[in-house]
């Protein structure tokens, strides 16, 4: 998958996806192999999007849900022709049709297959559902229910990875389609850290045991996985605060104030031997998001320098611990 394809570049304008390549390639080597089509539960068939990559893992998962002659489909892959072939073969082989198309969010690796789906099944044209829809789609709202034989699917608005992100609870299985908020392996790119953390706690509150992620294998203990995701982000917050406290003890920024640039803070947390490209293009933007969350929480203050009126603050603006 080419860097930036599928909507990821838009998540954080300062993030250059290429900077993650070495890390993501090493992560990919540990991924389990998944079949192109697999019946993963009595009610759920998973179809791979045929778009494996550094951010998509084994590929975008499409889920076909239900047990009868009419079924739901969740997400549509990236628009790879081989994916469309798999969908057609799966439907004809199982002798069932699709009633509704549910999209977790707007990114291209989830919505790119819609044109192929409508070309094959034009009757679905008025049955494409998405939160904050465009003029060709129908809305999904929090709590909305979609029912087919053998499956009751409840929509859960879950912003964080993207503003329009939806998860879906499969009531009969105590399972949740987690979209890109929680992946089968590793952690997702995040549009807004503070919102994402609130959302993950909300996702936990539904009490689902299984997770069907948009990328990666089935999550067998969703509660534990969500807990680990939250703990990892909180650990980064603590490390950032610890570094700022140390700076305050050293007198940087004046009495009781720890003042560090984002560059200095990344070095304090990750060490000073990090590749410059990864530091500038990956770690600094993420640390900036951590600091913005801490500022929202009232834990740190901003001391901007060299900022023009109406301009976006430089990522190297200095941060002040309170």
From Swiss-Prot:
InterPro entries: LACTB2-like_MBL-fold (IPR047921), Metallo-B-lactamas (IPR001279), RibonucZ/Hydroxyglut_hydro (IPR036866), Sec-metab_biosynth-thioest (IPR050662), WH-like_DNA-bd_sf (IPR036388). Binds 2 Zn(2+) ions per subunit. GO terms for biological process: secondary metabolite biosynthetic process. Zn(2+) 1 binds at residues 105, 107. It catalyses: atrochrysone carboxyl-[ACP] + H2O = atrochrysone carboxylate + holo-[ACP] + H(+). The active site is at 109 (proton donor/acceptor). The keyword Hydrolase applies. Pathway: Secondary metabolite biosynthesis. It holds the Pfam family Lactamase_B. Keywords: Hydrolase, Metal-binding, Zinc. It is an enzyme of class 3 (hydrolase). Its cofactor is Zn(2+). Its EC number is 3.1.2.-. It comes from the Eukaryota. Zn(2+) 2 binds at residues 109-110. One of its GO terms (molecular function) is metal ion binding. Atrochrysone carboxyl ACP thioesterase; part of the gene cluster that mediates the biosynthesis of the tetrahydroxanthone dimer neosartorin, which exhibits antibacterial activity. The two different monomeric units appear to be synthesized by the same set of enzymes, among which the Baeyer-Villiger monooxygenase nsrF is the key enzyme for the divergence of the biosynthetic routes. The pathway begins with the synthesis of atrochrysone thioester by the polyketide synthase nsrB. Belongs to the metallo-beta-lactamase superfamily. This is Atrochrysone carboxyl ACP thioesterase nsrC. It comes from Aspergillus novofumigatus (strain IBT 16806).
């Amino acid at each position: 998958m080419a860097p930036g394809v599928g909507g990821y570049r838009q998540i954080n304008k300062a993030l250059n996806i290429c900077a993650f390549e070495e890390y993501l390639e090493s992560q990919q080597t540990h991924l389990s192999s998944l079949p192109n089509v697999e019946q993963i539960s009595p009610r759920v068939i998973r179809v791979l999007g045929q778009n494996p990559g550094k951010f998509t893992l084994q590929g975008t998962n499409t889920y076909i849900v239900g047990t009868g002659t009419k079924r739901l489909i969740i997400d549509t892959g990236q628009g790879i022709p081989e994916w469309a072939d798999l969908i057609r073969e799966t439907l004809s082989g199982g002798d069932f049709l699709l009633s509704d198309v549910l999209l977790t969010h707007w990114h291209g690796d989830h919505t790119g297959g819609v044109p192929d789906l409508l070309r094959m099944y034009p009757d679905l044209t008025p049955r494409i559902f998405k939160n904050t829809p465009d003029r060709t789609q129908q809305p999904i709202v929090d709590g909305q229910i979609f029912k087919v034989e053998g499956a009751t699917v409840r929509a859960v608005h879950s912003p964080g990875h993207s503003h329009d992100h939806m998860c879906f609870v499969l009531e009969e299985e105590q399972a949740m389609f987690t979209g890109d908020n929680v992946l089968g392996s590793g952690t997702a790119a995040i549009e807004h850290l503070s919102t994402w953390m609130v959302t993950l706690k909300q996702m936990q509150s539904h009490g689902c045991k299984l997770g069907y992620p948009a990328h990666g294998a089935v999550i067998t203990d969703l509660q534990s996985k969500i807990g680990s995701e939250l703990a990892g982000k909180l650990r980064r917050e603590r490390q950032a605060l610890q570094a700022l406290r140390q700076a305050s003890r050293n007198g940087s920024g004046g009495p009781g104030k720890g003042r560090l640039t984002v560059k200095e803070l990344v070095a304090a947390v990750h060490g000073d031997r990090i590749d410059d490209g990864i530091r500038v293009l990956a770690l600094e933007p993420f640390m900036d998001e951590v600091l913005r969350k801490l500022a929202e929480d009232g834990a740190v203050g901003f001391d901007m320098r060299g900022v023009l009126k109406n301009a976006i603050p430089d990522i190297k603006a200095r941060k002040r611990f309170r």
